[in-house]
Amino acid sequence: MNDIKIRFGNKLKKLRKEKTDLSQESFAAQIDLDRTYYSSIENGKRNVSLVNLEKISAGLGITLSELFSDIEKE
């Protein structure tokens, strides 16, 4: 079973590409996060705070529950 951070990062990358078609840099700037910090989340290397999860979900136009749906299945 993959680490939860890796599974979440994979889901986040997929959603970013599907919902925004923006690069990591452009999306991070849009939601007011540092690009390297955001990249490390997508790569499963960092934990993320609730405040930043809210920024990410808003930037993707989805709810927090949608952000976490199906992570266990990946």
Swiss-Prot record:
CDD domains: HTH_XRE (cd00093). One of its GO terms (biological process) is DNA restriction-modification system. Gene3D superfamilies: lambda repressor-like DNA-binding domains. GO terms for molecular function: DNA binding; DNA-binding transcription factor activity. Pfam families: HTH_3. Residues 23-42 bind DNA. Coiled coil: none annotated. SMART domains: HTH_XRE. One of its GO terms (cellular component) is cytosol. Keywords: DNA-binding, Restriction system, Transcription, Transcription regulation. Signal peptide: none annotated. Residues 12-67 form the HTH cro/C1-type domain. PANTHER family: HTH-TYPE TRANSCRIPTIONAL REGULATOR, HTH-TYPE TRANSCRIPTIONAL REGULATOR SUTR. Probably controls expression of its associated restriction-modification system MunI. This is Control protein C.MunI. It comes from Mycoplasma sp.
